[in-house]
């Protein structure tokens, strides 16, 4: 089979790894190679970072007004809209996500660039009302310099966009390192950035493996900020690497999000919300609602109706319009899911649905929608992120118990609440220790809405105005208005 060949984007040029080494990317639906990419090493990282630093210092980028940067971002958003079908098809092939879902994600990506473009010239400083009549002071937001974006395999386009747009709006340059399992659409985004008129070297993309390429990037002394999305184990390596140079960090990590269904909820909507929360994207989402908390009055009915609905999910080729659940993105992740399912069975969780690979003609990495009933929240399947189509359901008696179970987790990324009681919704939204709360909906996103978690789900926020400010340094400037000589040098003014 002929493989599609990709090159890296460094300084506006399409290049191979200096070593000439490559690696294959596998199609998850077929478990077969479909693309060949450069296997970058430390030397390639060095030239990418140096390219970004040179571009940051160049008048072609540094000399642009904020309004001009915003216009470039808006043009990039327009190009994404013009190329949406190509991008959707490419991502579906590369990481196994449903074509229905990739089309949906690509359709709202332009909004992220358009919204952020409008913020580029809104990064206002301020004057300080000093009580010192001979001094004047003001603040200004300035770009940081070279920043790095580490992108996972589950939603590379979306998770690149929410790093790239604010970084450029603030005036930085960037080196992107996508997952070796899903690099194609990030490279395509770099091509569109060049087409939009963004100067060479402002957006660079290097491909390779985390322990080599990623590690070299995160410890590079010229990288002033790292935006990372991924698992906690890798994040710990990133934190240690970045500490060498005190680079700032934004970490969007895992979750074990509670999806709480009260007896007064609209059950039809709640069941669809549960399916969306855990079986969409084959459960490969940081915000997956993998812990289902159901009030005891409706517990049995809800579980039976959820089983009936989930058992009808159509598994198959992600590029088929009728498919509702595609494969896992990697063989390694499929093995992780199978291991956690085995642990759940050994611990006494009751398997109600799935728990195995489906019988399909394809050799891809598919897994059935799976549901466990659990009698305690301390079970491993209730505490560890699966990152697959595996939900665990537990009953609760009242609001207080639901809150206790919801907060009994090392994670705090997202939560869902299904109820008609407005007061209850507000109380739980206030008291649940999670960065995102959805009430009577799930997986809603907007360019205006910050994304990020509490506890072991990371820190920092992406999307919204705060995400752009997070890519700036705040400078304070003092001006002496007096014509008088400097007073006593040993007394602080």
Give the location of each predicted region.
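Residue-level signal for inorganic ion chemistry
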Residues: 31, 69, 91, 113, ...
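Glycine-rich loop-to-alpha-helix module at the N-terminal edge of alpha/beta enzyme cores
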Residues: 34-123
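ALDH superfamily catalytic-core signature
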Residues: 225, 233-376, 439, 486-493
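Proline-centered turn/helix-capping motifs that create local helix->coil transitions or kinks
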Residues: 114-129, 311-315, 346-353, 359, ...
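Conserved C-terminal structural/oligomerization subdomain of aldehyde/semialdehyde dehydrogenase
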Residues: 30-36, 223, 260, 314, ...
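Hydrophobic face of amphipathic alpha-helices that form TPR/SEL1-like repeat modules
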Residues: 1-30, 55, 356
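Short, well-ordered beta-strand elements within core beta-sheets of diverse protein domains
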Residues: 33-40, 57-61, 148-149, 259-262, ...
């Amino acid at each position: 089979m002929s493989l599609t060949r990709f090159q890296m984007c460094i300084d506006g040029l399409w290049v191979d790894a200096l070593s000439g080494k490559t690696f294959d990317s596998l199609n998850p639906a077929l478990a077969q190679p479909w693309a060949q990419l450069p296997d970058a090493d430390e030397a390639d990282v060095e030239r990418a970072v140096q390219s970004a630093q040179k571009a940051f210092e160049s008048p072609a980028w540094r000399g642009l007004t904020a309004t001009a940067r915003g216009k470039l971002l808006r043009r990039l958003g327009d190009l994404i809209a013009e190329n949406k079908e190509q991008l959707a098809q490419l991502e579906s092939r590369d990481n196994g996500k449903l074509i229905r879902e990739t089309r949906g994600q690509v359709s709202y990506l332009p909004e992220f660039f358009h919204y952020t473009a409008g913020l580029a010239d809104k990064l206002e400083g301020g004057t300080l009302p000093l009580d010192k009549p001979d001094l004047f002071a003001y603040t200004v937001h300035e770009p940081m310099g070279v920043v790095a974006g580490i992108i996972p395999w589950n939603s590379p386009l979306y998770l690149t966009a929410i790093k790239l747009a604010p970084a450029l709006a603030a005036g930085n340059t960037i080196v992107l390192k996508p997952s070796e399992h899903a690099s194609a659409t990030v490279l395509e985004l770099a091509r569109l950035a060049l087409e939009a008129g963004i100067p060479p070297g402002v957006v660079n993309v290097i491909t390779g493996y985390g322990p080599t390429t990623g590690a070299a990037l995160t410890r590079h002394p010229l990288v002033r900020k790292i935006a990372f999305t991924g698992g906690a184990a890798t994040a710990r390596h990133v934190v240690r690497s970045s500490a060498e140079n005190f680079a700032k960090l934004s970490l969007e990590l895992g979750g074990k999000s509670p999806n709480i269904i009260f007896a007064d909820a609209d059950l039809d909507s709640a069941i669809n919300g549960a399916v969306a929360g855990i079986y969409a994207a084959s459960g490969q989402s940081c915000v997956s609602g993998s812990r289902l908390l159901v009030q005891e009055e409706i517990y049995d009915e809800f579980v039976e109706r959820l089983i009936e609905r989930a058992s009808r999910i159509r598994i198959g080729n992600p590029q088929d319009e009728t498919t509702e659940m595609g494969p896992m993105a990697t063989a390694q992740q499929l093995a992780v899911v199978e291991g956690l399912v085995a642990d759940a069975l050994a611990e006494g969780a009751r398997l109600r649905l799935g728990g195995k690979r489906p019988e399909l003609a394809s050799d891809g990495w598919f897994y059935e929608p799976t549901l466990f009933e659990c009698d305690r929240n301390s079970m491993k399947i209730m505490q560890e992120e699966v990152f697959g189509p595996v939900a665990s359901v537990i009953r609760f008696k009242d609001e207080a118990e639901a809150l206790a179970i919801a907060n009994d987790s090392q994670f705090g990324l997202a939560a869902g609440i299904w109820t008609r009681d407005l007061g209850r919704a507000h109380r739980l939204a206030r008291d649940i220790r999670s960065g995102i709360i959805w009430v009577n909906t799930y997986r809603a996103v907007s360019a205006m809405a910050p994304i990020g978690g509490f506890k072991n789900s990371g820190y920092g926020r992406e999307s919204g105005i705060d995400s752009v400010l997070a890519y700036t340094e705040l400078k304070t400037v003092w001006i002496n208005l007096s014509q008088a000589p400097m007073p006593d040098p040993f007394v602080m003014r």
